[in-house]
Amino acid sequence: MPLDVALKRKYYEEVRPELIRRFGYQNVWEVPRLEKVVINQGLGEAKEDARILEKAAQELALITGQKPAVTRAKKSISNFKLRKGMPIGLRVTLRRDRMWIFLEKLLNVALPRIRDFRGLNPNSFDGRGNYNLGLREQLIFPEITYDMVDALRGMDIAVVTTAETDEEARALLELLGFPFRK
């Protein structure tokens, strides 16, 4: 039995009908929907100390509810003292209910906890209907307490939609409650 996530229900009951009305889709499968959310954490300092990677993976797993995959260096770069295959980051891909739960938490709890938050940058769409945002610290999530944190680590969040254009994607995310800057 799938979970009843409020944001998911909002999409099916309010957002989808509004998008059909606004853009005049002929078929419900044409309506843009969320495909996945990819969270990436670059940890350059992890090449010196493996414990940093473990701690960051623990925190990311708490935030997302899913074990992160370790990303490794594609090639060696001597200026960065980097060898091919060294662990340099973490990545989590959320789909279905986990994605909806994470987004609900991001929109309702995490973003409002950011100091001096004035809204998300409306220009961070990639031209293909996907939205990217960066967070400076992991403390804004309720699962992470101040005592657990050894260092502030940011993360990149990519919201992948089936929208063909940025205009459609922006309408979808705005209706879902993403707080864009005016």
Swiss-Prot record:
This is one of the proteins that bind and probably mediate the attachment of the 5S RNA into the large ribosomal subunit, where it forms part of the central protuberance. In the 70S ribosome it contacts protein S13 of the 30S subunit (forming bridge B1b) connecting the head of the 30S subunit to the top of the 50S subunit. The bridge itself contacts the P site tRNA and is implicated in movement during ribosome translocation. Part of the 50S ribosomal subunit; part of the 5S rRNA/uL5/uL18/bL25 (TL7) subcomplex; has also been isolated as a complex with 5S rRNA, bL25 (TL7) and DNA binding protein II. Forms a bridge to the 30S subunit in the 70S ribosome, contacting protein uS13; this bridge is straddled by the 5S rRNA. Contacts the P site tRNA. It comes from the Bacteria. The keyword Membrane does not apply. The keyword Ribonucleoprotein applies. GO terms for molecular function: rRNA binding; structural constituent of ribosome; tRNA binding. Keywords: Ribonucleoprotein, Ribosomal protein, RNA-binding, rRNA-binding, tRNA-binding. Belongs to the universal ribosomal protein uL5 family. This is Large ribosomal subunit protein uL5. It comes from Thermus thermophilus (strain ATCC 27634 / DSM 579 / HB8). GO terms for cellular component: ribonucleoprotein complex; ribosome. Pfam families: Ribosomal_L5, Ribosomal_L5_C. InterPro entries: Ribosomal_uL5 (IPR002132), Ribosomal_uL5_bac-type (IPR020930), Ribosomal_uL5_C (IPR031309), Ribosomal_uL5_CS (IPR020929), Ribosomal_uL5_dom_sf (IPR022803), Ribosomal_uL5_N (IPR031310). Gene3D superfamilies: 3.30.1440.10. One of its GO terms (biological process) is translation.
